[in-house]
Amino acid sequence: MDKKKIAIIVTFMLIVILGLGITYAWLIQTINGDKIHSIRVGNFRFSLTEENSLTLESGEFMSDDKGMNQDGFKFSVENIGVGYGSYSIYLDDDTIPTGTTRLNDKFIKYSLEINGNKYSPLELKDRKIYNGILNKSGKDNITLRVWLNKDVNGDIGGQAFKTKIRIEANQEVSNQQATTITYDYNYLVNDVFDEYYNTNIFNPCCETAISLTKYETYYDDVGRVFFVTANKNKANRGWYFPSNNVLAANKTYTYSFEAKANVDLTAIIGSEQEGTAGQIGNIKYSLTSEYKRYTRTFKADSNKYSAFIFYDWTDTNDRTIEIRNLQIQEGGLSVAEIVKMKGTNLYTFPYLKRDNYQLLGWYTDPVNGDKIDENTIVPSTDTTYYAHWKYIGEK
């Protein structure tokens, strides 16, 4: 394989459709240094930042992980009008030098990062690479990354890939055409549960009110499971994980877990720092024989009670509760949001990497649901999709 440097030369071309007229604006990317070059066309503003070149260094074929870690070509699209606007991004062929062979698209892979969220890499099969929609004052900060697809064999010596980014924008879109898609990662990216709670100790509470007959921790195909069988004869009793550290008072935290029980029951589950004097605000969850996901966001209180508790069902017969993927992090849920045009394809999804887990795809429910793909049509109402994972670490 020829190891010559192959450059992606970028020309930036903007087209904005304004009512019945069409305005063309061309911006040739030639700037260097720390400047930001902006152009306004109609009610849209387009900007190129200082990091504005794409280069395939030494003709190297890259894995997706390596390609996704390039600096990329950065630009932004901003709606400075008074209503919604849509736009599409194209990678068009640009003129290559006479006598040079154009590199076949099959060798090219690309990915977009939009407002800090990386989206899954795609092969360059269609020169329209993105459809976006912006509310008034909305802005998308975009990074385009392009690399040579290591999964495609062939000689690329002496070939060139030269493209121009074309953006078509339409200012005639109503807000009834916009749908907000939330991609829920279905795990907490900055999970610190084991930092704050000792999961090696299953503590019964209190006196002889509860009897733990079996408790263990193991991993199934989805994640870590805490399995407890117990009986008890008093309300406001149960078992808990003692705290290693205290949550910072007045800070916001989110916990999430999946749970099921051998019979239908209601249990209080959560941090004692949500509330005062050992109470957690009567946060009750109805558990059934099937796993269901539960999430809660709260502001931590400062009090002497700081365990994570599983309380308040009352039955002298043995009851089994299984808690899976129990996590906590500062802030809210780990999600990505994007506004899409109703009736178009979803097209691409957030790019997620999680240690010891394999991403199975995106579904309509956090535990079960139907699987969706890039051809799924954007629904007419705001919708959340959930990542599903398979645990592949040591069990």
Model-derived regions, located:
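Short, polar/proline-rich extracytoplasmic segments that appear immediately after membrane translocation
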Residues: 2-65, 157-161, 170-180, 393-395
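Short, surface-exposed loop/turn segments at beta-strand-coil junctions that are enriched for proline
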Residues: 14-16, 147-156, 299-303
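Surface-exposed interaction patch
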Residues: 18, 22, 28-29, 65-117
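Extracellular and organelle-lumenal recognition/adhesion modules and their flexible linkers in secreted
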Residues: 26, 38-43, 70, 77, ...
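A surface/secretory-pathway sequence property marking extracellular, secreted
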Residues: 42-51, 88-90, 94-127, 206-207, ...
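Short proline/glycine- and polar residue-rich coil/turn motifs
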Residues: 62-66, 130-139, 284-292, 300-301
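C-terminal, structured domain-capping segment
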Residues: 69-86, 90-92, 130-177
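Secondary-structure capping and domain/repeat boundary segments
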Residues: 175-187, 333-395
